[in-house]
């Protein structure tokens, strides 16, 4: 998934307890510092219809060209997923 300054490389997985999660890395392809990136994960059925939503946060800060791991619990597994960045905090990097 590419959303301008962010790129997401994620997939469905299972938590240690066996529950479905969507996990991966979010990349800050922009030039400034960002922190606490909020994500919306939409669970889709085989026809592309949204059958569930979950929100999570990639906690911590990232400089430009950095990445951060995230893991968002899902209500149920789906055929595919759509991921969107909802919001983020910015900070000065002194560059």
State each model region's role:
Residues 1-19:
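Transition segment at domain starts
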Residues 26-31:
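Asparagine-centered strand-capping/turn motif at beta-strand->loop junctions
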Residues 33-36, 51:
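Short acidic/proline- and small/hydrophobic-mixed sequence motifs that coincide with surface turns
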Residues 38-42:
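Beta-strand signatures of extracellular beta-sandwich domains
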Residues 48-55:
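Surface-exposed loop/edge segments in extracytoplasmic proteins
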Residues 55, 71-95:
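Terminal connector regions
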Residues 59-66:
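Short proline/glycine- and polar residue-rich coil/turn motifs
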